[in-house]
Amino acid sequence: MSARQYTDQLQKLDTPFYFYDMQLLADTLAKAVAEAGKYGYKVHYALKANFDPRIVAAIRKAGLGVDCVSGNEVRLAIESGCPASEIVFAGVAKSDKEIRYALGQDIFSFNCESLQELEVINALAAETGRTARIALRINPDVDPRTHKHISTGQADSKFGISYTEINEAIRSLNHLPNIRIVGIHFHIGSQITDMEVFGNFCVKVNKIQQWFVEQGIELKHLNLGGGLGVGYNDPDGKPIPDFAGYFGIVNRTLETKPGQTVHFELGRSLVAQSGELVTRVLYTKQNAAGRQIALVDAGMTDLIRPALYQAHHKIESLTGQGPLQPYMVAGPVCESSDVFAKEALLPEVKRGDLLTIRTAGAYG
């Protein structure tokens, strides 16, 4: 089901708005859970990808845990009925207030991103006599072969504890009685479509985990984060990502220990394809360079990815007909970066036409 099937009804609505294919979402979740289940893997939903209440309800119905990166996300997960025992709290800069709230909810684990954060969580847990469960987020220095703005696991990154600091982190744990390590956590980037990257990543994880084994440290949980990409160029060609290939290469490459649980934090791959941003053409014009421009009522305030890192989304006309020609599709914000596409191929665009921006269900 796509927005195109409901063009007549959609023309009567105020724009812009998001259109969600809830059946595609349900099918995507079912496929992800089934493929992960073949190997006993646990999937958490990265709430930052989309926290629309209907989306979150579908996630809970599918039985996924939740990955949060703010105190408000932890609160939303709790209020949405997610058990605290299935919530992990990541985020490179957690505030004291957020940490205290998550401690009070007794969430499953904090993914800790610096040596100083370990000390802060220990001190805040000690205030109420609690012991916080933590996983060390380790930066493995792996090239994810994706856009630099969504690469999060290379050496020159703000994310995680450098693998060269692992020894120091473990020594510090001996003097922090109010935290208990339950595992290690990674996340190397987003929109990764080359499966070889995940294989190389798992090889690095194996080496890091072996170091822990040699230190006599038992890791009950391995959290590999997420990163699986989707087909922005051809949303109809493969609407459900390759979960079989993704979990399969991890299973073939990752060396788990007996009794160990492997976790994933998926966001984009679960929800992106199910969402479209429907917008109306307000004006058309041609600039001095001869470029045809369609000015629409949606902007970077509704979908920031194209402005933030020149992300591509396929744009289609729901109402136009005829031969395709290139258009710049731009929003109303007073920023030159408020452009969804510089050369979207569309039939002749007229004032009042409805356009739909595909694969917009994540990170709008």
What are these model-derived regions, one by one?
Residues 58-59, 81-83, 103-104, 124-127, ...:
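Short, glycine/charged-enriched secondary-structure capping and boundary segments
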Residues 47-51, 72-73, 93, 114-116, ...:
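Active-site-proximal loop/turn and secondary-structure-junction residues that shape catalytic pockets
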Residues 67-68, 111, 135, 185, ...:
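Conserved beta-strand positions in the central sheet of alpha/beta enzyme cores
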Residues 44, 133, 221, 261, ...:
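Hydrophobic "anchor" residues on beta-strands that sit immediately upstream
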Residues 46, 133-139, 185-187, 223-225, ...:
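Short beta-strand segments
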Residues 141-284, 346:
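Active-site loop/helix belt of alpha/beta enzymes
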Residues 1-132, 171, 175-180, 207-217, ...:
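A charged N-terminal "starter" segment
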Residues 3-4, 249, 259-364:
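Charged (often Lys/Glu-rich) extended helix/loop segments that serve as interaction or gating elements
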